[in-house]
């Protein structure tokens, strides 16, 4: 397996990216914190978002000292604690970063929401944080529950669109409000019409909360969800989970990077999506003991699995090429008025 690529001074874990097709360059956005905080686990509560670039995930240009804090908590804003995993997309007039954060004064300080930041320059070291706060609602747990195996989950947004439906969808790592404690991990689905996207980004219009993409009743957490196309026509819903939270009947408790095949995602009438929310037929793409977590499939590299090194930190290729293909993540025709 290829070596982990380390930042010269920071501990690095979850990442997401935008691929510049003209330059053939990956813009990586990554969580990072002081290495001195790792042993105590406090790095999760001091994380900011950094920016780096790479041609192939074999070598990474980490930029200068300003590059590891391009997005960080803002005093006086609801996102006043550490920043957690997100997604980045290009729109006609710039770039949007969907991210996870918390209001430290709310509940136990661990209640999460999705926020949005904007820049017109992907190389910028200062993103403009919008006031938008997308909170958990509908069937999804709104705060931590006493006795649960893990705290609240409403994080790790992943966006795609179906142009034929004029709809934009967002997946979110979540928990069911009425699920069994310790088995309530789920993947939420939200949507908004193309015409309302700009208003939804600025908080002037609401997202529609749909039934979960997955609510199998056998995971405490289903983190960093993503959706891809399989070359043979199905779709693959992927996510990460730790072995100690994996109670699925088909995975032997291995945890790690897993997937669920969705055979008929697209309805013939092109109205909505047909997930398999109760299916327990998960496959392990890479078990936790391979020491990669919060993995992403990189369609531009033959669907190779890339994640962060859960032992040493840093970003590492797996050498495993799934051949999974990207959903439509082209938002370049949409103008967002910020």
Please provide the spans of the model-predicted regions.
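Carbohydrate-active catalytic/glycan-binding domains of CAZyme proteins
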Residues: 1-338
